[in-house]
Amino acid sequence: MDPYKHRPSSGSNSSFWTTNSGAPVWNNNSALTVGQRGPILLEDYHLIEKLAQFDRERIPERVVHARGASAKGFFEVTHDVSHLTCADFLRAPGVQTPVIVRFSTVVHERGSPETLRDPRGFAVKFYTREGNFDLVGNNMPVFFIRDGMKFPDMVHAFKPNPKTNLQENWRIVDFFSHHPESLHMFTFLFDDVGIPLNYRHMEGFGVNTYSLINRDGKPHLVKFHWKPTCGVKCLLDNEAVTVGGTCHSHATKDLYDSIAAGNYPEWKLYIQTIDLDHEDKFDFDPLDVTKTWPEDIIPLQPVGRMVLNKNVDNFFAENEQIAFCPAISVPAIHYSDDKLLQTRIFSYADTQRHRLGPNYLMLPVNAPKCAHHNNHHDGFMNFMHRDEEVNYFPSRFDPARHAEKVPIPPRVLTRCREKCIIQKENNFKQAGERYRSFDPARQDRFIQRWVDALTHPRVTHEHRTIWISYWSQCDAALGQKLPSRLNLKPSM
């Protein structure tokens, strides 16, 4: 064994206790002292090392998606999509790719109950032959905002009050009263699907718009959808209180126990695609992350299935240290000009470097399974064994060359630089359509959740008037019922 290439793991455990450097430890129960009752000696290196390691076990918590659980499995192509993309892992039916998935809540801290009303993260890392592909989404198909400039403020509004350290509805109501594009997302969050039964019984969505490119270089805008084969199930508010009071990690436990018992969760992957020549034919902007693409106009197309059949071996290594980023893609799956996606491309990688260090992609759970080569050297916690003499490019001493170019069609950009909003905001139509799709009992529960939010003592009459105006523009009947329950007169 080459000791310079050896990576410590549980597979190399010795039969006796050692220090981190491998020295034998003959007593792991007592500190080194002067006699039986004397002071502890600083020279007890094993004690110092043990305490220092313990003091540094925790790493910075994720700003969002702190509470989560991961599982491993595979993705298998079931339908031919080669006419849409030449991505290698989608090349033909039957092709399988290893994956790891992390499910999560979004706003709340690492130890919070998994029964809180909150979006759920649904992030998939594909270990393909052309590098990793991170499809980083949620269990809801839309988002609160369409421009990443607002993201830090939005998260601050959802997070606890910096003075009281309490999450308070008045802050959420106040912030989003300035952002009517959030209404569609709230028809999901304040709907029954706002609290999934567990991770196995929820959908997943790529949320953002991406671009697929085929061998001829023709692009299509695309959205990704995960559908659970066991169906979608949710918890009502009173059920969530009961479940959360019994086990605050119920979703993590359910996922782990199901896989351990051989009841492997499975999702079908579907896509929706739009030809770039048709993107102006709708009453919404296909790059607007606050909108869904109507399935009666843009039907779902089956692609494959994902099965999770293995639990993680170590929660910290494969759940806390796993890092996702929408920028991590593969040839023939490209970004679109979706404003939120464009900002996520930077922000996700940046937060991982803060949380895990500049070499976070070397961690086994994040590293590609395929061969890879570059001149990204050194930095904190770089544990890659390298012995080459040439660390620049190009060189006649290094045979590495440029990869084959992916056929990404050029786009001519000629407009003026400006900070602006999109033209087709259309903030109310889809929110109203979704509300009207609810049965009466479901509508009533939706209204009651808004009544609860708008009756917070810090919510002002102006706030209530604005929200009633918004919901009235979504649905006239909703605009009448909400003020009636609030004992207010509707503004329109």
Curated annotation (Swiss-Prot):
<dbReference type="GO" id="GO:0005777">
    <property type="term" value="C:peroxisome"/>
</dbReference>
<dbReference type="InterPro" id="IPR020835">
    <property type="entry name" value="Catalase_sf"/>
</dbReference>
<dbReference type="InterPro" id="IPR011614">
    <property type="entry name" value="Catalase_core"/>
</dbReference>
<dbReference type="GO" id="GO:0042542">
    <property type="term" value="P:response to hydrogen peroxide"/>
</dbReference>
<dbReference type="GO" id="GO:0009631">
    <property type="term" value="P:cold acclimation"/>
</dbReference>
<dbReference type="Pfam" id="PF06628">
    <property type="entry name" value="Catalase-rel"/>
</dbReference>
<feature type="active site">
    <location>
        <position position="138"/>
    </location>
</feature>
<comment type="similarity">
    <text>Belongs to the catalase family.</text>
</comment>
<dbReference type="GO" id="GO:0005737">
    <property type="term" value="C:cytoplasm"/>
</dbReference>
<feature type="active site">
    <location>
        <position position="65"/>
    </location>
</feature>
<keyword id="KW-0560">Oxidoreductase</keyword>
<dbReference type="Pfam" id="PF00199">
    <property type="entry name" value="Catalase"/>
</dbReference>
<dbReference type="GO" id="GO:0009737">
    <property type="term" value="P:response to abscisic acid"/>
</dbReference>
<dbReference type="GO" id="GO:0009410">
    <property type="term" value="P:response to xenobiotic stimulus"/>
</dbReference>
<dbReference type="InterPro" id="IPR024711">
    <property type="entry name" value="Catalase_clade1/3"/>
</dbReference>
<keyword id="KW-0576">Peroxisome</keyword>
<dbReference type="GO" id="GO:0020037">
    <property type="term" value="F:heme binding"/>
</dbReference>
<dbReference type="InterPro" id="IPR018028">
    <property type="entry name" value="Catalase"/>
</dbReference>
<keyword id="KW-0349">Heme</keyword>
<feature type="binding site" description="axial binding residue">
    <location>
        <position position="348"/>
    </location>
    <ligand>
        <name>heme</name>
    </ligand>
</feature>
<dbReference type="GO" id="GO:0042744">
    <property type="term" value="P:hydrogen peroxide catabolic process"/>
</dbReference>
<dbReference type="GO" id="GO:0005886">
    <property type="term" value="C:plasma membrane"/>
</dbReference>
<dbReference type="GO" id="GO:0004096">
    <property type="term" value="F:catalase activity"/>
</dbReference>
<comment type="function">
    <text>Occurs in almost all aerobically respiring organisms and serves to protect cells from the toxic effects of hydrogen peroxide.</text>
</comment>
<dbReference type="GO" id="GO:0046872">
    <property type="term" value="F:metal ion binding"/>
</dbReference>
<dbReference type="GO" id="GO:0009733">
    <property type="term" value="P:response to auxin"/>
</dbReference>
<dbReference type="InterPro" id="IPR010582">
    <property type="entry name" value="Catalase_immune_responsive"/>
</dbReference>
<protein>
    <recommendedName>
        <fullName>Catalase isozyme 1</fullName>
        <ecNumber>1.11.1.6</ecNumber>
    </recommendedName>
</protein>
<dbReference type="InterPro" id="IPR002226">
    <property type="entry name" value="Catalase_haem_BS"/>
</dbReference>
<dbReference type="InterPro" id="IPR024708">
    <property type="entry name" value="Catalase_AS"/>
</dbReference>
<dbReference type="GO" id="GO:0000302">
    <property type="term" value="P:response to reactive oxygen species"/>
</dbReference>
<keyword id="KW-0479">Metal-binding</keyword>
<comment type="subunit">
    <text>Homotetramer.</text>
</comment>
<keyword id="KW-0376">Hydrogen peroxide</keyword>
<keyword id="KW-0408">Iron</keyword>
<dbReference type="GO" id="GO:0006979">
    <property type="term" value="P:response to oxidative stress"/>
</dbReference>
<keyword id="KW-0575">Peroxidase</keyword>
